[in-house]
From Swiss-Prot:
UniProt organism field: Thermostichus vulcanus (Synechococcus vulcanus)
GO molecular function per UniProt: cytochrome-c oxidase activity; heme binding; metal ion binding
Enzyme Commission numbers on file: 7.1.1.9
Binding site for Cu cation: H258, Y262, H307, H308
Transmembrane segments: 35-55, 85-105, 120-140, 164-184, 211-231, 252-272, 284-304, 321-341, 355-375, 390-410, 426-446, 470-490
Record InterPro entries: Cyt_c_oxase-like_su1_dom, Cyt_c_oxase-like_su1_sf, Cyt_C_Oxase_1, Cyt_c_Oxase_su1_BS, Cyt_c_oxidase_su1_bac
GO cellular component: plasma membrane
Official protein name in the record: Cytochrome c oxidase subunit 1
Length: 552
């Protein structure tokens, strides 16, 4: 994509860049987009471990029907905060804040984000939010689920519930600030030689994500502020006995929280569109279709939220409308899946760790999408609403989708961030354990849901015990899968093989600078002369010319 193809030879030692950041700079209040990106990733991963420990504790409780491993109130608090942490403090910050901050300026040829100080502020709102969330356990912990529906959220552990609300508002503010920054950066700061049809697909995904967050997040903030007033100041926005309406809260909550699924998956789709062509050594199939499908998901995704409320007294016409809109939003997603499959077809695929997680994502997301189609239709959803069928669905989509994609991105861009390669043997072990653990844990939950086991309960009918025990064993396998990943990260960051500037032979602009990049990314800004996914085009052109010469 730049003027000159970078060599793929690997140096013997990591070069010293006088203008590169040192390790201790990552612990400071820094405005450089790369430092902030790493800070997002590391902080989010710490919360991922905390949320994962809560999940293991809950699965241990659910291993048997009469277990007393967790106090019921503590189980409810773990349930609430596990979901909250995994969504608001792991996937969203890692995908948008982590990869978005690190990669977008590098991919468009900018020296930093448009508003560096605003960028730093957006990150530094996250650690206090997480601390506030964890501190709520000193007051019993929020126990109303990650949805925090009233009236339950207004009568249980009200101090902890208020802390939960304030934490989410802080994270939402961070999201809004970051969205403004990404939109301005992509729109105004790409190098003059880069046309819109040369913009990397990850940047298209980040643009769509930012637009969606900017529209939906303030609605959640408004709904939570009203809930905070009901809890602490005697208002009655959601109190039916005083003229309020709890269904209004559901509308406000889901208007953000279903688009939040796309906030978590759109950047991951962008990562997929970068990883697959590089490691398949083929141009991406359907560049424009993938770019426009991100914008289509952004638009249609704002009109599907009521499928979470089919059992909340919604009228038939509303059920019909939102069933149709839910099925329509699957179309642009299908465009991406088929484009990735077409890109893989006939490619020279390198089955390294990044590519394995990308392919794993495709299989997991398709499985989750199939159950999503059934949940999007009102007649089926009414029967399996609030059962483990729903739990299985969203874990296949969000863990099998988002987390697999985050792992693919880490294995792909770790050499750029650190200058060193991750160990492939540990990476493949990590992938195998994660794939087995994911299916072992969540696939049996479909059976639990179809047989009627409700979600969010610590005690259940003994008939469900054998399947729950299977799920719990799978959860431990999934938990242990993180160990080789952590060993790989820590060891490779210090002792890993030197990567060189472009170990994968990538054509997007981040591969034209040093690894790790300079403080201002480049000594001289790059010039774009070809597309970001023109892999093998020159060889095919040479082959065509030779065939033409032979015919003559």
């Amino acid at each position: 994509m730049a003027q000159a193809q970078l060599p793929l030879d690997t140096p013997l030692s990591l070069p010293e860049h006088p203008k590169a950041w040192k390790w201790y700079d990552y612990f400071t209040f820094n405005v450089d987009h790369k430092v902030i990106g790493i800070q997002y990733l590391v902080t989010a991963f710490i919360f991922y471990l905390i949320g994962g420990l809560m999940a293991v504790a809950m699965r241990t409780e659910l291993a048997t029907a009469d277990s007393d491993f967790l106090d019921p109130n503590l189980y409810n608090a773990f349930l609430t905060n596990h979901g909250t942490i995994m969504i608001f403090l792991w996937v969203v910050p890692a995908a948008i804040g982590g990869f978005g901050n690190y990669l977008v300026p590098l991919m468009i040829g900018a020296r930093d984000m448009a508003f560096p100080r605003l960028n730093a502020l957006a990150f530094w709102l996250n650690p206090p939010a997480g601390a506030l969330l964890l501190a709520s356990f000193l007051f019993g912990g929020a126990q109303a689920g990650w949805t925090s529906y009233p009236p339950l959220s207004t009568i249980t552990a009200t101090t902890a519930q208020s802390m939960w609300i304030l934490a989410i508002i802080l994270v939402g503010t961070s999201s809004i600030l970051g969205s403004v920054n990404f939109i301005v950066t992509i729109w105004k700061m790409k190098v003059p030689s880069m046309r819109w049809n040369q913009l990397p697909l990850f940047c298209w995904a980040m643009l769509a994500t930012s637009l969606l967050a900017l529209v939906s997040t303030p609605v959640l903030a408004a709904g939570l502020i009203l809930l905070l007033f009901d809890i602490n100041f005697g208002t009655s926005f959601y109190k039916p006995d005083a003229g309020g309406n709890v269904v209004i809260y559901q509308h406000l909550f889901w208007f953000y929280s279903h688009p939040a699924v796309y906030l978590m998956i759109l950047p991951i789709f962008g990562i997929m569109s970068e990883v697959i062509p590089v490691h398949a050594r083929k141009p991406i199939f359907g560049y424009q279709a993938i770019a426009y499908s991100s914008l289509a998901i952004c638009c249609v995704g704002l009109f599907v939220w009521v499928h979470h409320m089919f059992t909340s007294g919604t009228p038939p016409w509303m059920r019909m409308f939102f069933t149709i809109s839910t099925l329509i939003v699957a179309v642009p997603t299908g465009v991406k899946i088929f484009s990735w499959v077409a890109t893989l077809w006939g490619g020279k695929i390198r089955l390294n760790s990044a590519m394995l997680f990308a392919i794993g994502l495709m299989s997991m997301f398709v499985l989750g999408g199939l159950s999503g189609v059934t949940l999007g239709t009102a007649p089926v959803d009414i029967h399996v609403h609030d059962t483990y069928y729903v739990v299985a669905h969203f874990h296949y989509v969000l863990f099998g989708g988002s987390v697999f994609g985050l792992y693919a991105g880490i294995y792909h861009w770790f050499p750029k961030m650190t200058g060193r390669l991750l160990d492939e043997r540990l990476g493949i072990l990590h992938f195998v354990l994660t794939l087995i653990g994911t299916n072992w844990t969540f696939l049996p939950m479909h059976e639990l849901g179809l047989k009627g086991m409700p979600r969010r309960v610590a005690m259940y009918d003994p008939q469900f015990e054998p399947v729950n025990l299977i799920c719990t064993i799978g959860a431990f396998v999934l938990a242990f899968s993180i160990i080789p990943f952590l060993i790989n990260i820590i060891w490779s960051w210090n002792k890993g093989k030197i990567a060189g500037d472009n170990p994968w032979g990538g054509l997007t602009l981040e591969w034209t600078t040093s690894s790790p990049p300079l403080i201002e990314n480049w000594e001289v800004l790059p010039v774009v002369t070809k597309g970001p996914y023109d892999y093998g085009i020159e060889r095919r052109q040479e082959s065509t010319d030779e065939d033409h010469d032979e015919q003559e």
